[in-house]
Amino acid sequence: MKIIHYIPSLDRASGGTAAYMQLLAKELGKLVELHVVSHTSNNPMKMENCEVHNVASMCHPLEMNRQWTFLLHEIQPDVVHVNCCWIPACAFIQKWVQDLGYKVVLTPHGMLEPWIMKRHYWTRKLPALWFYQKAAVMRADVLHATAESEKENLLKLGYN
C-alpha cells in the first residue's frame, strides 16, 4: 500500500501535529510505502521510514499544484491523508487530489473542537467555513478523529 501524508509544517517549533507525524511515520513506514509531503522548514523534525517531499507554499499556488500533480502521478498512492484544518492550502490540496480521483482521509487533530470553533469565530472561522473548510470536511472520503471526544464533536457538526 502507498500512502501520502500531507502536513503543513514538519518544523520542530510547529507543535504537536509534527511530533505526531514523526511518531506515526516511524512505525507506519515499516508497513507501507510512506511519503510525507510538507513545505520547506528551517528546523525540520527527523523523519524515519518515509520519503519526505517539500512542495511550494500557497504563496505560489500554481507551482504547488504542479508539484502535487507530479507527485501523485509518480507515486500513485492508494490514499492521501491530510493532517490539518483552517489553512487554505489543506483544502486546496484535498480538492486537487480528489479531482484526480484519489481517496482522501482528513484528520483535523482537534482543530474542529467546539472551543477552537468559538475562538475568532466571526473574524476567522466563519469566513473559512464559508470559503473552504466546511466543504473540505464534507468532501473527505474518511474523517479521522484522534479521540472519542473528538469523534463525538465531529458527529455533532453534521458535516460528514
Go through each PLM region and give its residues.
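A short, charged, and often flexible helix/loop element on the N-terminal side
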Residues: 45-75, 79-88, 119-125
